[in-house]
């Protein structure tokens, strides 16, 4: 059979017969012949002829399997799954601990290969795709300086790479990161407090505010609570406060967690379907930031003793 695709951009597409059953193919002008090379439970690896970009992608996948030592990793996975099927938690923990160095080494080897491959393909769409899919999302864009440096770096990609959708996707994300970077005015947050009254972040303008994004079900979030209490005590009477922000769906669990953890500061429960993760560029919780009296973000991703040490740099 034949597919005719009107695609003006050279880009990676998913080719399959139904969602989750298929694999990736680089779309480019010409007559591409596609047949399955390997079919696994996790999807299909397509063999594509008549395409320079797909040859580059195929060669990268083969090299990646070698440097990562995928055969060894597959055998370790099999051992872990066998122990899991037996519900042998002790054996699962042992395998996980002893396997970790191999996975870390594999990730380091893959990262090195990715960077080398990107450097060798700065002029073509494959290079920008690989950069976007493997490296871009793992970079730190918490400051305006980092965002500016990233925009400058992307200018190094050639004209053909600049015409791909990946540049537009990254620019859109950088614009979003700029809105929640250190030095930017913290976006407004609105919701209800523990008594059901309206509350918003700007109510605390004029104070230093630790904003703690958390949920009652998040174990790691609640482990930060003792450190937050220390911060509240350390800066008592110094124009400082804490605002907990949660998107808990069950108000009773949210209230119970606040009471149980002795989180004796202001709390805000977000309205349903509030996309706070996008607004604040949050990749996971806990996500704790410091906002200054002027409403600007002073610090991000604070943990443990940083909840006292970082504000101390600003509060005198």
List the model feature ranges, each with a label:
Residues 145-192, 197, 202-207, 233, ...:
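N-proximal helix/coil linker or "cap" segments that precede and/or mark the start of modular domains
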Residues 101, 138-146:
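Short coil/turn connectors between adjacent alpha-helices in alpha-solenoid helical repeat scaffolds
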Residues 1-109:
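A non-transmembrane, solvent-exposed segment enriched in polar/low-complexity residues
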Residues 120-137, 168:
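Amphipathic alpha-helical repeat scaffolds of TPR domains
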Residues 262-263, 270-315:
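Thiol/disulfide oxidoreductase modules built on the thioredoxin-like
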Residues 222-261, 271-278, 309:
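Structural microenvironment flanking redox-active thiols in thiol-disulfide oxidoreductases
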Residues 208-209, 286:
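Alpha/beta-hydrolase fold active-site loops
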Residues 205-206, 213-230:
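Conserved redox-active cysteine motifs that mediate thiol-disulfide chemistry
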